[in-house]
Amino acid sequence: MMDSALYHPRIFFAHSFINGLYSSPRFANTCWRLVSRSSWEIKASENSDRNVFDENPVRKTDGSLFDSASFETVDAEITPETDDFFVSDAEGDPDCPTQGYSSIELALQALRKGKFVIVVDDETGDVEGNLIMAATLTSPKDIAFLIKNGSGIVSVGMKKENLERLSLTLMSPEMEDEDSSAPTFTITVDAKSGTSTGVSASDRAMTVLALSSLDAKPDDFRRPGHVFPLKYRDGGVLRRAGHTEASVDLMILAGLRPLSVLSAILDQEDGSMASLPYMKKLATEHDIPIVSLTDLIRYRRKRDKLVERITVSRLPTKWGLFQAYCYRSKLDGTENIALVKGNVGNGEDILVRVHSECLTGDIFGSARCDCGNQLDLAMELIEKEGRGVVVYLRGHEGRGIGLGHKLRAYNLQDEGHDTVQANVELGLSIDSREYGIGAQMLRDIGVRTMRLMTNNPAKFTGLKGYGLAVVGRVPVVTPITKENRRYMETKRKKMGHIYISDNNDQPLA
């Protein structure tokens, strides 16, 4: 039988003969099995005349079938489905705040009233939080509060056109590089009118208001000064996940002019960067909404149009005829593809696979993962259904870490790390993929409700809340091999992927 740590010995697979891969008639003609809790049913073909298997399957050294290089796909005659992915409806809603944080809507309400908001950039690692408010609504009292609880540096987030209008050049021209992650400070300024030394809360408030004025001119300011203009990068937090971009984005979303006042929050006891508990205490004491930058990114991704359709072309494949839709990201120019089978029609109950790019698995047939097998199976099942969509997302290599880092992680796995430990050892995210682009592609194609082919709860939740409803899940069940067994076991245990238990008939959560 199959060398597998995840599947019970009695579970069979009816293997599709895709890419010339070998299989076994004996293995394929075993009996069917019903998995009760999730209503999955995978059934072997009862048609012994069906010639889809290699007559000379490769054997292991001990004579058994399926050596470590075998990674066939499953032929599911009855599409396995489940209605539940063990997550709440709110979990995948981009408008639902991270636990312990305020909603973006609450923050926008506060900003419209001239109140402060705290923006935190990383709720899991080394955090940095900024107090922000609308520059156009700033008072001396607000600046005094900002100086007391912040770093003492009062900054103003501004768009490029406003900086150019006031002839505010960057302190370091090399920071003009759009790929730089560092904040882009301009020459500091003080307002000439209505100020003395420029250092008091009143003087700095006057400078902030002068920078916000539509009538302001370059000659209205002394250089250097005590207020630090910051250049906002076009695209906002969708281009650079920084506090400058977050603060200006929030002003735009609140319907205010795109100018913000901000300062990093310090611990008043020792002068260090404030911890998350410290910032939450400050927020509670002063009734200030505190929001996660991650939540703001999700909020914007739901509302902004992130892709544009470039072209549609007929694409014959080895599975059948599809229509290829090419989309270009408005954020970074990356081109993604969706393969559409049949007529989407009213967009209801569409079989969908959102597949993350995996060069090694999809193209070169790597046995380290199950990616290529999953893509093959998705194409086959959609062809059989006669109606469905495969979205292929680039930039997801190695769960978002990139090809080079993925290969470095492979070396660590060969030394004994699992796929999660390897990413952590490299100082990288376990899974940094984001599915908003894919969701918008599906919406443009016309999909409204879908049966999602995935084993990954993060993918399920990542597609919810974009005007799409996931009405069912189709597990993508592919064989386990000697090479990918530990990888898939780690995904099940540490990342919540759902497979079939090796001990019982229940789906694994």
Curated annotation (Swiss-Prot):
Residue ranges of the region described as Inactive DHBP synthase: 44-302
Pfam families membership: DHBP_synthase (PF00926), GTP_cyclohydro2 (PF00925)
Binding site for GTP: R353, V354, H355, S356, E357, Q374, E397, G398, R399, T419, T454, K459
Enzyme class: hydrolase
Entry GO CC: chloroplast
Top-level division of the source organism's lineage: Eukaryota
Tissue-wise expression: Expressed in leaves, shoots, roots, flowers and siliques.
Cofactor(s) of this protein: Zn(2+)
Transit peptide, UniProt annotation: 1-43
Co-factor remark: Binds 1 zinc ion per subunit.
Family from the record: In the N-terminal section; belongs to the DHBP synthase family.
HAMAP family on file: RibA, RibBA
Function: Involved in riboflavin biosynthesis. Catalyzes the conversion of GTP to 2,5-diamino-6-ribosylamino-4(3H)-pyrimidinone 5'-phosphate (DARP), formate and pyrophosphate. RIBA2 and RIBA3 together are not able to complement the loss of function of RIBA1.
Protein name: Monofunctional riboflavin biosynthesis protein RIBA 3, chloroplastic
Lineage: Eukaryota, Viridiplantae, Streptophyta, Embryophyta, Tracheophyta
